């Protein structure tokens, strides 16, 4: 009786996880596009990172702080932990678990944390 409802609940959670992974993947693409187009500008009053977060905040209707966080996690997913990012995009882990892995490996000197 409850199994079908629980199955739908599990699938909804996986869909939410996949959406979070997709959001970070798209933000990562946006980051690459900005850097290819503008690069790091020494003459700008702000750096490219700030410009990207300002654009994201306006587009998504979120604070710049949250946009900054999304960009940092998107960069971690793309550059440092693509395998963990793949788990998030597949819905196998949730966004909080992804954040925890990123945080705990942020300054890790262990080479296994880096892509091959």
Task: Report each predicted region and the residues it spans.
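Peripheral, non-cofactor segments flanking catalytic/redox cores
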Residues: 1-116
């Amino acid at each position: 009786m409850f199994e079908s409802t629980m199955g739908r609940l599990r699938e909804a959670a996986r869909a939410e996880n996949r959406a979070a992974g997709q959001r970070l993947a798209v933000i990562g693409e946006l980051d690459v596009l900005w850097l290819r187009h503008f690069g790091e500008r020494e003459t700008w009053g702000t750096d490219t990172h700030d410009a990207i977060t300002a654009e994201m905040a306006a587009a998504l209707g979120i604070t710049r702080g949250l946009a900054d966080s999304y960009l940092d996690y998107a960069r971690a997913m793309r550059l440092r932990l693509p395998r963990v990012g793949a788990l998030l995009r597949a819905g196998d882990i949730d966004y909080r678990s992804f954040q925890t892995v990123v945080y705990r490996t942020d300054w890790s000197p262990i080479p296994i944390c880096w892509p091959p």
